[in-house]
Amino acid sequence: MCHAREASPGTGEPEAAPRDNFPRAAGSKRGVGAAFETRAQRFLERAGLALVARNVTVRGGEIDLVMRERDGTLVFVEVRARANSRYGGAAASIGVRKRMRLLLAAHAFWARTGGANACRFDVVAFEGGRLVWLRDAFRADDAG
C-alpha cells in the first residue's frame, strides 16, 4: 500500500490533557467521539501536521483523521478514548479487526489521492487525564 518512510522517532510520551477528559456536554457517544477527534486534530496541528480530511468512510472502514506531515507523508489517525486503563487502555483497544478496517479505508483513500505519498498509521489515545500520541503505531504488513 503506502511506501513507508523511515519513521522519525516518536517519544510516545504522554502530553498534558485536561483532567476532565470526558466532556459531559457532548451528550451522545458520537458527540463525545467528535469532541475527542477535534482535540486530537488541534494537538496534531500544533505539532505541525495539516488536516487533509475527517471521518473518511468507505465501505467496511472509517478513518477518524487524515493529516499530512510537512514532508508530504499522509498520516492516518485513529482516535481512542478510555476513562481509565483498567481494560488495557485506549490504544490496546485497537484489535486486528479494527486495524484491518483502518487499512481498507486508508488504502481506498490513498489510491483515490494518487497513491504516491508515503504514509503511516498513528493513534492518539486519551487515557485518564493524558493524551498519548503513538506515531507509527502499526504498519500495513503487521495488521493481520
From Swiss-Prot:
- Tell me one Pfam family matched here: UPF0102
Spell out the InterPro entries in the cross-references: Restrct_endonuc-II-like, tRNA_endonuc-like_dom_sf, UPF0102_YraN-like
Q: Looking at the record's lineage, which domain of life comes first?
A: Bacteria
GO terms (molecular function) for this protein are: nucleic acid binding
Q: Where is this region: Disordered?
A: 1-28
Task: Report the family membership.
Answer: Belongs to the UPF0102 family.
Q: What is this protein called?
A: UPF0102 protein BMA2801
The species is: Burkholderia mallei (strain ATCC 23344)
The lineage, from the top, is: Bacteria, Pseudomonadati, Pseudomonadota, Betaproteobacteria, Burkholderiales
